[in-house]
């Protein structure tokens, strides 16, 4: 829509996959659909991040967000250390490859801490989104480690 200016596609893989998290913050994301990112694996410390891993896959939801909304979202204290990178994801429904941004923690921050509550919430969400059962278990395992 005109009034928001430029839009970006973002591959969300953490709790922001829940659109209501974003709409409660006053954002207006347009859901494009579930997708998979090859060559990365999920890691849950204090929050979720993706780490490069040749043989792995991470699942998420692609949404379109106004650039200014994305900037506002990632300027919040809990997520402002995340850095955007350019990725190509595959939409699960069509197999179409699309370019998107993905926000990850820098490697030196990625492994800090462990939040079993976050892991539990994210595994519940991943299950509700009907992601691969093995992937749901991979997320849930982070909750059992802490």
What name fits each language-model region?
Residues 4-146:
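Glycine-aromatic micro-motifs
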């Amino acid at each position: 829509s005109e009034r928001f200016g430029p839009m970006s596609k973002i591959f969300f893989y953490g709790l922001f996959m829940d659109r209501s998290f974003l709409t409660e913050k006053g954002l207006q994301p347009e859901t494009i659909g579930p997708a998979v990112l090859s060559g990365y694996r999920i890691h849950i410390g204090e929050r979720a991040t993706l780490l490069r891993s040749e043989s792995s896959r991470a699942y998420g939801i692609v949404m379109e967000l106004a650039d200014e909304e994305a900037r506002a979202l990632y300027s919040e204290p809990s997520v402002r250390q995340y850095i955007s990178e350019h990725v190509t994801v595959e939409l699960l429904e069509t197999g179409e490859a699309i370019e998107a941004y993905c926000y990850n923690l820098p490697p030196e921050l990625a492994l800090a801490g462990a939040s079993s509550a976050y892991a539990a919430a994210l595994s519940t969400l991943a299950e509700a989104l009907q992601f691969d059962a093995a992937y749901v278990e991979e997320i849930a395992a982070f909750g059992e480690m802490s």
